UniProtKB/Swiss-Prot annotation:
UniProt main location, coarse: cytoplasm
Molecular function GO terms recorded: unfolded protein binding
Similarity comment text for this entry: Belongs to the SecB family.
Transmembrane annotation, as ranges: none
Name of the protein: Protein-export protein SecB
Keyword presence, tRNA-binding: no
BP-aspect Gene Ontology terms: protein folding; protein tetramerization; protein transport
HAMAP family: SecB
Subunit structure comment from the entry: Homotetramer, a dimer of dimers. One homotetramer interacts with 1 SecA dimer.
Gene: secB
Record has Cytoplasm as a keyword: yes
Organism: Alkalilimnicola ehrlichii (strain ATCC BAA-1101 / DSM 17681 / MLHE-1)
GO cellular component, one term: cytoplasm
Length: 188
């Protein structure tokens, strides 16, 4: 009985001086760019409010130093009353993420889906705040499935690469990790 020791306290590797194999950390979150344009105010406030609203979302990734990446999520919301733009709101929320010890596919998944999902609540709050401060009704952005967008982007890239190979190009598709989504709705 005296020879038995507790197993698996989760600190064995750290106590032996080894670094954990996988590390994920949010190093910094920041508002990178923000704008609200209301080109037709105050006239836009005089009529009935039944705008056509379009939401565009993009995510871009760039490598910084070893194991550090910037992910920038941009949301552009455009509301039109007929042919006139009521407002154009654009917010870019960014973060620096430390990602070490992951295989390429897992790291790319974190950068392409998980990191933008961490930034989205900040974008949602900033967009809503700007639009209401501009005198317009609240604009609550609906949830976004970043995992599905990332998988869709991977499938599109694979199809592009397959088409290029079929045409004899054979070149690999390169570019920054990004996701894009568009939506249109009528705000009431």
């Amino acid at each position: 009985m005296a020879d038995e020791q507790p197993q698996g306290n989760g600190q064995g590797a750290a106590q032996q001086g080894e670094q954990p194999k996988q590390q994920f950390q949010i190093a910094k979150l920041y508002l990178k760019d923000v704008s609200l344009e209301t080109p037709n105010s105050p006239e836009v406030f005089t009529g009935e409010w039944k705008p056509q609203v379009n939401v565009d979302l993009t995510s871009k990734t760039r490598a910084l130093q070893e194991g550090h990446y910037e992910v920038a999520l941009t949301v552009t919301v455009t509301a039109k009353q007929g042919e006139k733009t009521a407002y154009l709101c654009e917010v870019t929320q960014a973060g620096v993420f430390q990602i070490k010890g992951f295989e390429d596919a897992a790291r790319n998944g974190l950068l392409g889906a998980y990191c933008p999902a961490q930034l989205f609540p900040y974008v949602r709050e900033t967009v809503n705040s700007l639009i209401t401060q501009g005198g317009f009704p609240a604009m609550v952005l609906q949830p976004v499935n970043f995992d599905a967008l990332y998988q869709q982007r991977l499938a599109q890239a694979a199809e592009r690469q397959k088409a290029e190979q079929a045409q004899g190009g054979g070149a690999e598709a390169k570019g920054s990790d990004s996701t894009a989504a568009q939506g249109s709705d009528t705000q009431q």
